[in-house]
Regions:
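Glycine/proline-rich active-site loop of Rossmann-fold NAD(P)-dependent oxidoreductases
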Residues: 138, 151, 163-179, 186
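N-terminal Rossmann-like NAD(P)+-binding domain of SDR-like oxidoreductases, especially those catalyzing
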Residues: 1-163
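Conserved catalytic core of Hanks-type protein kinase domains
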Residues: 74, 184-185
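Hydrophobic residues in alpha-helical segments
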Residues: 84, 185-186
Length: 186
């Protein structure tokens, strides 16, 4: 089993589509649908969608823990401007929720792929405190580094830079910059 947090979102849904085509893994998507949507669901018997917050991952996936190969943690609050407007939601998702994902992986020896952000490494790392979003994401990277030192926790980090493509959000408060441009152009 591969678990994808944020599986109903832009990046997560495209990853699910790829994994369904290229692997034989069963897939569990965890999403709170704050920016993800059911229209992004990949209809396939190998995919199961669960509506929940990442902070509840342990109690929800406990029965699957010995069957999970890896977790792709893409389900975090992910907009800079909105992190000022909804700082509590940003912290709940990116700090509390991510901590639960990290602990679940660590406790059950599950491989983790973490989605970092260019917002926390801009200006040679000096921009990591420019927004609640960048701050929480940079602190998560520090936590992962410490988990590696303390417990030999193994993980991989991927960085996304203005991603675009199928299922991107083109309108509303969670729209991506490229999605807004596309929406105005079309």
């Amino acid at each position: 089993i591969i678990v994808i947090t944020g599986g109903a979102g832009f990046v997560g849904s495209n990853l699910i589509k790829f994994l369904v085509k290229k692997t034989n893994f069963k897939i569990i998507s965890i999403d709170n649908y704050s920016s993800g949507t059911k229209k992004n669901h990949i209809i396939n018997s190998k995919v199961k969608y669960l509506k929940l917050n990442t902070k509840d991952i342990s109690k929800t996936l406990n029965s699957y823990k010995n069957k999970i190969n890896s977790i792709f943690h893409f389900g975090e609050f992910s907009r800079i401007y909105q992190s000022f407007v909804n700082m509590n939601l940003c912290i709940e998702s990116n700090t509390i929720g991510s901590n639960e994902v990290f602990n679940f992986c660590l406790s059950n020896k599950i491989k983790l792929v973490y989605s970092a952000t260019s917002a926390s490494i801009g200006n040679s790392g000096q921009d990591k405190n420019l927004s609640p979003y960048a701050f929480t994401k940079s602190k998560n990277l520090e936590m992962l580094e410490n988990l590696k030192k303390w417990f030999k926790f193994e993980y991989e980090v991927v960085y996304f830079y203005n991603v675009y493509g199928p299922n991107q959000i083109c309108s509303g408060s969670m729209a991506t910059v490229i999605g807004i441009f596309e929406n105005q152009y079309l």
